[in-house]
From Swiss-Prot:
One of its GO terms (biological process) is methanogenesis. Can form a complex with MtmC. Catalyzes the transfer of the methyl group from monomethylamine to the corrinoid cofactor of MtmC. The keyword Nucleus does not apply. Keywords: Methanogenesis, Methyltransferase, Pyrrolysine, Transferase. It comes from Methanosarcina acetivorans (strain ATCC 35395 / DSM 2834 / JCM 12185 / C2A). InterPro entries: MtmB_MeTrfase, MtmB_sf. This is Monomethylamine methyltransferase MtmB1. One of its GO terms (molecular function) is monomethylamine methyltransferase activity.
Amino acid sequence: MTFRKSFDCYDFYDRAKVGEKCTQDDWDLMKIPMKAMELKQKYGLDFKGEFVPTDRDMMEKLFQAGFEMLLECGIYCTDTHRIVKYTEDEIWDAINNVQKEFTLGTGRDAVNVRKRSVGDKRKPIVQGGPTGSPISEDVFMPVHMSYALEKEVDTIVDGVMTSVRGKPPVPKSPYEVLAAKTEARLIKQACAMAGRPGMGIOGPETSLSAQGNISSDCVGGQISSDSHEVSQLNELKIDLDAIAVIAHYKGNSDIIMDEQMPIFGGYAGGIEETTIVDVATHINAFVMSSASWHLDGPVHIRWGSTNTRETLTIAGWACATISEFTDILSGNQYYPCAGPCTEMCLLEASAQSITDTASGREILSGVASAKGVVTDKTTGMEARMMGEVARATAGVEISEINKILDKLVALYEKNYANAPAGKTFQECYDVKTVTPTEEYMHVYDGARKKLEDLGLVF
């Protein structure tokens, strides 16, 4: 029997009230790891050390495993402690009817996001910005302006305001609402100051509640052609606040950016198991959230980085598989261990840019330097590198890509425990003119030379 109607966030809410009861510990510690392990064995998944896959049969098995993971497990609602299940037809209905392209921004600054494929010769969209990193109120505008001034950058992804009017943006407080609005307004002003007033932005990042997220759609703030973020929870979980936010975005005809960062070494387990969950999470973004695009970001449980050998492999296989078997549009976010003004940070970001570009990502989003947790440690220079490397990578043979990545990751992977802290934005840039220091330009050139030595042609 066919499904009654296409699934949406309202159906999710209704099913979250009546679905099968389950404790969160049972979900996290039993259902997710056991099913991921079972599916890895069932489909004989073995990535054989490739960052970007060349085995289409193995990719097809991965897609089947990810689809089955979502179908059989469903999604756990953390508020009701119940499991929301979809039918197979509901999942296929969502996959078959995704947005195949959309526009971010307005006027001459608008960019068209459309499907890429594995080994595509076209450079992906570069979404430059702090990527949820904490940014001081007094430099919030110049930090974001440093990205808008970069021609390699197409859209902006917001940072988190550490304060507004000198007060912390406590969730569900008036200050959170003010911060969510101010975040968007200041970034729009930063883009205008850079001569790109129509640039699309992606957020909000400061707010942690539904009321904060919804309030960012305001006069002078986010508009429908900006990416509006909603986040899934690890792994295959969601709360009802997020479902309410989705309802607002849908009702406002907003571009919806569904975000989630699968954890390697966490509930899902190893490389293949985490990739199965990543594929399931991609698909869920379009069933549950009616997403325009999904923002990925496999992260290492120990190092807090998206640029490790393991997380790059997960990202490469998940994206290539999604790209090969669906029309889903996908991005990835960047969290290097090292801080700005260091070669390691730039090389880490480069490795991920190579992986994402070659595996068919539509959007690269970053860079949250110093793992995205240190205040003011992110600048436009890291996004420049992300973009330049993407341009150099597009169209290169996948066999060559895997060789370059193996050598590149080897240059920095022994330094995670002692990654260089780097410098703050205020130390990397002239804050008044929003231009990088001579020191940073020298560091940048050094990293670029190492990439050229590995075979990239800029």
